Amino acid sequence: MYASNNTTAFWRDPALPHVESRRACNSRACYKPHSHPTFSIGAVDAGGSIFTGSQDGQAVLANGSLVLVPAGCVHACNPLPDALWSYQMLHLDAQWLQAHAPGLDGDTAAVLHCPLLYAQFCAMNALLFSRAGAEEKNAALLAFLRACVSACADPLPSERKPVPQQLAPVLETLQEQPSASLRQLAQAAGLSPYQLIRAFRAATGMTPHAYQLNAHVNRARSRLQAGTALAQLAHELGFADQSHLQRVFKAHAGITPGRYR
């Protein structure tokens, strides 16, 4: 499937359910800190941006920069102030990636500055958006991932600390009740709301509320691809109304739900 507008295009194919791609041109899209259940690879084509989430903290990305973002890694990438930027973003199913490119299966983002690898990424992504067959596209994707593994002399670093045992009941509650209140979550951990916010942010990089919104957006992505109506989706995810869903989705995904669909 190919869907586009003036600045953004998405590519998906039921024959390749493990991959989704996006292109954005002359965009002003800004993102709140967020995470994906997928492994993501981004490329900056024009303009500059500021990336947060790598082991080196904040990094400035320029034309030709690549960034590898493991599943679950909290990050954000935004254009320089008052500037436009163009970029490409690839999302890969995490289990599929682990099976086919385990060398990329870390948990900390990495920034690469490699002209040859960037050129290969662009060629591979152009092929995804073309009318080539699924086998040819998948072969190009696998070849690019092998090149990524070679370019990363060492596997991606694994520096994410285990979530403290005290927060395990909070994560379990969020799994069972995605819209649980802060008071409910604090009670599950045996902490005050303030203590929970501080401990949860230290462990996950997000406040409990930001974590909930991020999870809602990730659920919305899959539900939108399945054709769920926006009004129904807003109700299912606990948003006040459709407009509330649209605002939150755009803040995390850089595009409205209707355009993502």
Identify what each model region corresponds to.
Residues L104-Y118, A126-A189, A202-N214:
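Short, Lys/Arg-enriched, Trp-marked, Pro/Gly-tolerant hinge/linker segments that flank
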Residues M1-T8, C30-K32, D107-A109, E135-E136, ...:
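Jelly-roll (double-stranded beta-helix
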Residues V44, L174-Q177, R223-G227:
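Short helix-to-turn junction characteristic of helix-turn-helix DNA-binding domains
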Residues Y2-A3, T7-G106:
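N-terminal regulatory/effector-sensing and dimerization cores
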Residues L182-N218, A234-Y260:
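Basic/polar phosphate-binding segments, predominantly the helix-turn-helix DNA-binding elements
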